[in-house]
Amino acid sequence: MVNVEDRLYEGIAQQAGIAGCTLVDARMVRTGRAVALQVFIEKDETTAVTIEDCAAVSRQLSLWLDVENPIHGAYRLEVSSPGLDRPLKNLHDFERFKGSQAEIHLHGLTQGRRRLQGELLGVEDQKIVLKNAEGRWTFALDDIHKARLVPQW
């Protein structure tokens, strides 16, 4: 997986906003020789993303990408909702999904652990708080490599 550069990410976020949605995440994914720009959007915290929302963002992004040409080479544009296992990207996400199960991958080891799963307790003093059977854990956002919700069935 290749990170989307900050400037490109900001442009994608702006175009999603013009189409009435909020950018959750964007990434370039390579599978063999094919490259896809995957864009994950949400409408707002209470409204589900529809196929029409995805189409509107796709149209808006396609126009912008054609004009700005920020990606060199061929790629496929994919726009969708983030799904039940949505990524958690900022402090607002960690607070918003307080009470949910989450999986957190850290950049380095914390008490011998690089990956933790448990219940999100929210954000306290700009630190993310997670609770599991082993105890209570706190992390700075910068300590987290990636985080996602874990769907409960």
Swiss-Prot record:
Keywords: Cytoplasm, Ribosome biogenesis. The keyword Cytoplasm applies. InterPro entries: Ribosome_maturation_RimP, RimP_C, RimP_C_sf, RimP_N, RimP_N_sf. One of its GO terms (biological process) is ribosomal small subunit assembly. It is found in: Cytoplasm. Required for maturation of 30S ribosomal subunits. Belongs to the RimP family. PANTHER family: RIBOSOME MATURATION FACTOR RIMP. This is Ribosome maturation factor RimP. It comes from Acidithiobacillus ferrooxidans (strain ATCC 53993 / BNL-5-31) (Leptospirillum ferrooxidans (ATCC 53993)). The gene is rimP.
